[in-house]
């Protein structure tokens, strides 16, 4: 088995027994793929598919003028190069975007001859900037990294549902159908309690559904024919005879004797059963004599027309009465049809609706619809027809989308999954005269009707045939990712442009305008900017640690535009659904109001072409599990029979047991092995990335696992990352895919390494033609993340190391040797200790603080802005009025703090003065100014100072100056340093290239003769020593005798010169970019950003947690010598409360502790072997015991492929503990942990006798001691501690503000007032309600008194009393206070 560069150095013992069938997919694919499809940047204009930007342009263009004489056509787009790269955009606070240029063709038609083209003008039009995605799936918008979260919304299509009996008091189920398009009006059909069908458009007032059918052009007769079967009645000699369909009689009660061959088959009043029907069928009766009473109450199916006069005798849907029957008889009608209905499965719903329908003609129906959509406007025929057409029948206003059409056709049981984006109706389109209508009619014909099919299905469901849909089913919800949402926004912008363009197009022909004059790109740019800047789904990236980044990008939210809202989402939407299996994690979701609405993608899930989530499964062919992987969506999965991943298998790949636990139709059940069609690919298929990092997840309660998943995302990167001793084996994937590490793009040999960059000389076979073959990786050093934590990369490679593509070469924050490392391994004991671990408190040892185990670095960015004010420009300077020398000691001559200065609260970081208006001077001041020439008093000090409670070191300063404003010395120094760094990179690249070329030339030239040059005589033979002694320039002066060699030498020289030229151009570009002025906001002259690094040690009040939802606050830090210790005198680091385990049911933490104890013990034993300098063979044997013998099952490791040096390096890295991987649902068993404990020389119980460090006495019983992975969470007491004496007040109520951010006070609320009232503490109460709150004069006096040492107070009127008076007056009641 092949190990990567970092895996070789430290192998995790893997307990997994199940075969690893499938590699973990790239974790950020959902973001990157979606946006790549949107931009299609890598394809030429001709190759682009109709999706993303291309689709948006094609849907809006061509734009024709109102007269039809001019049109704008679209001919492809291209992107320019972004001005700044990602890092520069973050520093400068700009958006990382590329300019979009679109080729537009203006076609002008000849007015006289129709269709002839008079003129064509083509031009590239600038359409604004489109933000680009960074390689890690984020966007840089105004200098901050943001993530666009994918949205899980209801798929377009048709859905059938009922109201669960909530609408009507009787609890009757009212069924409804809803057609949801991708864009356009919603169409609802619904039953009311009287069983009539109504239609609503866009949730407006309801109308009888038949109005819509009438508007489409259907007559009453046609409607009845479409929805009902009929009974044929013939009249012979005054006797009514009904054509017998025996099946229709089942379940009815006979109202007359039914005869067959003269015998009574069914007596009057009896219920007709299946036996009776069989008898009737046997008798072969075609017509049944029926009494006239039987027909009364039935309805006519077709209008009856007098053959002679052509008038309608009786309209269809008329109830038959004795009078109507007589009328028919008089008219000489011998046969007619009645509607066949019954109460069971053929309700009279549409017939009832038709009778409630007031309209008679299509025009009346259109007018009725117009009145409902536009109440109060007078309808005209054209307006009504237009409105109706624009609702559902035109591409511009209505689009089901391919997904919607597919779902629509599938739900209605049609064969074909494709079709038009509009709602099609054959009858309506046959009558349309416009071009679009004719095209659709030719394509689709006159048979199909979407609306009728929906109604039919709805009526069928009401009749008891068919079921309603489950809207929480993942087959009915789809994922909208970045690309799709950006496309929609872009289209919105284009539609706005279209409106403006149409107006101007009529001018185009007369005034000779070009496309650029017609198109204003502002609306497009504004729509895109609004989406990326302020959409609900464009979120500030959670950058606490690599895991929180990855999780944020894989998040799926049901909220956002077009989605649900928190308040309206019910319990069902939030709940775990069977279709979530393998698609959405059932564990990871926030606690609080968003629970269940924000989810995380499962590890292996992906979205298919339609946006539905799919999960991979292995196909089972002929009872054997194949290697073929098939992705199934939630709908496809229903009919499959899917075996669990841990089903027992035979050698040949078949199933061992006859009956296997499977999933079928979303239920867990047991089925025969022959029926199985698929099998899961991995045990962690069910859970998300964060949950798959929790070892022994299978032993934790779900609620605690949820907390564990969420709290890992809040872990602060520690100063030195420490890999978890007990992991799940997934840490490596997260670290690699998160993008915080430096991953080799191509293989090669490391040429140079320092703390800030790695240079790799690429393997020859990976170098493409005509490029340098040098990869330079600049590392990120001490940079601020979005959450103010520190991003820092440290190289792992040494000079001369060989790396392969995708190897990790440098660790990022919270990464240790290529593995995610969010916390530290702590030696924990589970025992009570003097009440210091009451209620989940945590007791830690001073050693943890001393060793800086949980010390973290936080970086704050402080910005000072110099603006142009009305009184004059603000100035950044060290010349600040009324400030002593000491305060200026840390500033340079430009007034900006030095890098490396240690500052604390109140120190000046950037000196700034603001001009203030001329003030009237007192005579004394005038005198002083006259004597000393003091000019400084016309400016005031507005310097940027360090805020309260902050103490740290300045690590970086950035200065941005507006174009045209002279740069200060500091800005020039910063620019110089940046250019120097760039120059250094170029030099190194050139040096390696040169060495590489000379090395190849050397191989060719050794032993060859030269015809002089470089001071050599003709015929001199070149040896290795001579060549090694030559400078690079001298090489190219040589004149080899061999023509081939001479040609190679010349080619090499040209190549190097060309490369040098390219480098010079790159340097010039960089120089222009750096030294040019900056594009700052309006009125801003200069911006100085100061970065302050703060070191935070762990302290009481900080929140810590394990990975199992076991969180707590540090109560006290005890001296090392007072902590409980074992027989060797080794104290524990952390003492946890054992009572935190049983009730919380997260036993995983105990198993982790035991396994950690074994891991550490094994490391210590390896350490002893190294210290005793045991033979390498012995170390190999012991390692083999650990990896391949202890804990029988696990994955074997190929230690024989390691050289002796590699074994020693591995052993040295294992001294701190042998890392273990216990994968989710496939982890270590109890007996394996016991075996390892034994191998490590510990007791199998995992418990140890401890002694009290203070008294030296042994505790009464043994204590569970081991190693647990603890995290420090980003809820630090430093950020929460806050105190106020006086400060700012609210404007209206004059009460102190609240919260640390506003430097607010403690609210003494209603209940606290009750408490004081209950104790009768009148004076305290008075003080609280007046001088400490909103008695403006009183509080000023008290403050003055306290300063003077006088502790009296005289309370006055609280301001809130005046507010109350004003409120009463605003009600129109005059109220005045009387003065005593």
UniProtKB/Swiss-Prot annotation:
Biological processes per GO annotation: DNA-templated transcription
Highest taxon of source: Bacteria
PROSITE patterns: RNA_POL_BETA (PS01166)
Catalytic reaction list: RNA(n) + a ribonucleoside 5'-triphosphate = RNA(n+1) + diphosphate
Keyword presence, Transcription: yes
Key word Nucleotidyltransferase present: yes
InterPro entries tied to this protein: DNA-dir_RNA_pol_bsu_ext_1_sf, DNA-dir_RNA_pol_bsu_external_1, DNA-dir_RNA_pol_su2, DNA-dir_RNAP_su2_dom, DNA-dir_RNAP_su2_hyb_sf, RNA_pol_bsu_bac, RNA_pol_bsu_CS, RNA_pol_bsu_protrusion
GO cellular component: DNA-directed RNA polymerase complex
Keywords: DNA-directed RNA polymerase, Nucleotidyltransferase, Transcription, Transferase
EC number of the protein: 2.7.7.6
Quaternary data: The RNAP catalytic core consists of 2 alpha, 1 beta, 1 beta' and 1 omega subunit. When a sigma factor is associated with the core the holoenzyme is formed, which can initiate transcription.
Job description of the protein: DNA-dependent RNA polymerase catalyzes the transcription of DNA into RNA using the four ribonucleoside triphosphates as substrates.
Family that this chain belongs to: Belongs to the RNA polymerase beta chain family.
Protein name in the entry: DNA-directed RNA polymerase subunit beta
The organism's taxonomic lineage, starting at the top: Bacteria, Pseudomonadati, Pseudomonadota, Gammaproteobacteria, Oceanospirillales
